[in-house]
Amino acid sequence: MSYYAFEGLIPVVHPDAFVHPSAVLIGDVIVGAGVYIGPLASLRGDYGRLILEAGSNLQDGCIMHGYCDTDTIVHENGHIGHGAILHGCVVGRDALVGMNSVIMDGAVIGEESIVAAMSFVKAGFQGEARQLLVGSPARVLRQVTDQELHWKHLNTKEYQDLAIRCRTGLSETKPLTQAEENRPRLKGTTDVKPKSAQ
């Protein structure tokens, strides 16, 4: 793992969290229990504090950063999709930020809200609970349905379980030169399906 102290501040990582070896954590970063941090994520706590609360996930290629005297926070069970950027913002409990979305300074995503993939949430946006945000700039489309929230919970559970699986089942290796006959398929721990398959 790439952990760097910055001006005396050392990242804090709960022993039950999983941080991929290619992720980078610098300075004032606090990672809670059961958190999953994916490959190539960058958490640059060289100005503001970065906090990932228990059960949250920050997937492949995500960036967290913020200005001095600010906290960038992903609250409990927050779900941050591949390639998203969080800058000086707050993501509420059980909220989901879709792939390649950008959440700007001072923005607050309400608890149990969903930010659609590729959305841009402007600085200072103050969200409420269970909002579906879509577009660039993002606007509130409607309330998140119970079915959508259930789908989000299943996805987050997969990443919470993946943190455990990676701590015990991930190891560096050399590739095979060809696929073996009857190559097994990996399984998740829930019955979650892509939204298009629902």
Curated annotation (Swiss-Prot):
<dbReference type="InterPro" id="IPR011004">
    <property type="entry name" value="Trimer_LpxA-like_sf"/>
</dbReference>
<dbReference type="InterPro" id="IPR050484">
    <property type="entry name" value="Transf_Hexapept/Carb_Anhydrase"/>
</dbReference>
<feature type="region of interest" description="Disordered">
    <location>
        <begin position="174"/>
        <end position="198"/>
    </location>
</feature>
<dbReference type="GO" id="GO:0016740">
    <property type="term" value="F:transferase activity"/>
</dbReference>
<keyword id="KW-0808">Transferase</keyword>
<comment type="pathway">
    <text>Amine and polyamine metabolism; carnitine metabolism.</text>
</comment>
<comment type="similarity">
    <text>Belongs to the transferase hexapeptide repeat family.</text>
</comment>
<protein>
    <recommendedName>
        <fullName>Carnitine operon protein CaiE</fullName>
    </recommendedName>
</protein>
<dbReference type="InterPro" id="IPR023446">
    <property type="entry name" value="CaiE"/>
</dbReference>
<dbReference type="GO" id="GO:0009437">
    <property type="term" value="P:carnitine metabolic process"/>
</dbReference>
<dbReference type="Pfam" id="PF00132">
    <property type="entry name" value="Hexapep"/>
</dbReference>
<feature type="compositionally biased region" description="Basic and acidic residues">
    <location>
        <begin position="180"/>
        <end position="198"/>
    </location>
</feature>
<keyword id="KW-0677">Repeat</keyword>
<comment type="function">
    <text>Overproduction of CaiE stimulates the activity of CaiB and CaiD.</text>
</comment>
<dbReference type="InterPro" id="IPR001451">
    <property type="entry name" value="Hexapep"/>
</dbReference>
